């Protein structure tokens, strides 16, 4: 059970490449305290909701305020459950699958000249990029706005789950993939 409300056993990841990297195991406390940071690829052992909470703490306003980010995420999940009548964890996983870019651009140097080259994105990076863009989209939408960050996070997750281009995460993914397409 997540937040003592949502069943984690009914959730499934549809993207076969991301199954290993999206952890939805039930946890009493979504605060590992960096327990997995010393392990290689230890973040795959962290619950994906805790990773979203950690991504929400990126800006100056939210630095170190994990309980505030926890409450924001919990309230956003309640809003998602009320609006969609579905498990909000499944909606979040669908949003992560849709918002993760499949290819991006890296820079190669040939004789002192930097040339962009299109490369495939690893599944771990896809999850990281998706979570970061969802959290960034929510904080950007709530900045200097009457909408609270709770509503903005819920909207961002629902729009990304629907693969809607008005979502910040989806628009960033499409921009990255468009640049990669031109660099082939």
UniProtKB/Swiss-Prot annotation:
InterPro entries: Ribosomal_uS7 (IPR000235), Ribosomal_uS7_arc (IPR026018), Ribosomal_uS7_dom (IPR023798), Ribosomal_uS7_dom_sf (IPR036823), Ribosomal_uS7_euk/arc (IPR005716). GO terms for molecular function: rRNA binding; structural constituent of ribosome. Signal peptide: none annotated. GO terms for biological process: translation. It comes from the Archaea. One of its GO terms (cellular component) is small ribosomal subunit. Keywords: Ribonucleoprotein, Ribosomal protein, RNA-binding, rRNA-binding. Pfam families: Ribosomal_S7. One of the primary rRNA binding proteins, it binds directly to 16S rRNA where it nucleates assembly of the head domain of the 30S subunit. Is located at the subunit interface close to the decoding center. NCBIfam families: PRK04027.1 (NF003106), uS7_euk_arch (TIGR01028). Part of the 30S ribosomal subunit. PANTHER family: RIBOSOMAL PROTEIN S7. Belongs to the universal ribosomal protein uS7 family. This is Small ribosomal subunit protein uS7. It comes from Thermoplasma volcanium (strain ATCC 51530 / DSM 4299 / JCM 9571 / NBRC 15438 / GSS1).
């Amino acid at each position: 059970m997540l937040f003592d409300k949502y069943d984690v056993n009914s959730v499934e990841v549809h993207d076969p490449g991301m199954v290993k990297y999206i952890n939805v195991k039930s946890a009493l406390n979504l605060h590992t305290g960096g327990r997995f940071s010393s392990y290689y690829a230890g973040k795959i052992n962290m619950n994906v909701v805790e990773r979203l909470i950690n991504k929400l703490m990126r800006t100056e306003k939210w630095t170190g305020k994990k309980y505030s980010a926890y409450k924001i995420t919990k309230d956003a999940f309640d809003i998602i459950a009320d609006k969609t009548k579905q498990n909000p964890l499944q909606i979040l996983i669908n949003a992560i699958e849709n918002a993760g870019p499949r290819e991006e651009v890296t820079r190669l140097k040939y004789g002192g000249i930097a040339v962009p080259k299109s490369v495939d994105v690893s599944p771990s990076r896809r999850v990281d990029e998706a979570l970061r863009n969802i959290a960034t989209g929510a904080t950007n939408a709530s900045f200097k706005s009457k909408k609270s960050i709770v509503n903005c996070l819920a909207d961002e997750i629902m729009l990304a789950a629907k693969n809607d281009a008005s979502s910040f995460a989806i628009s960033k993914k499409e921009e990255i993939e468009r640049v990669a397409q031109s660099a082939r």
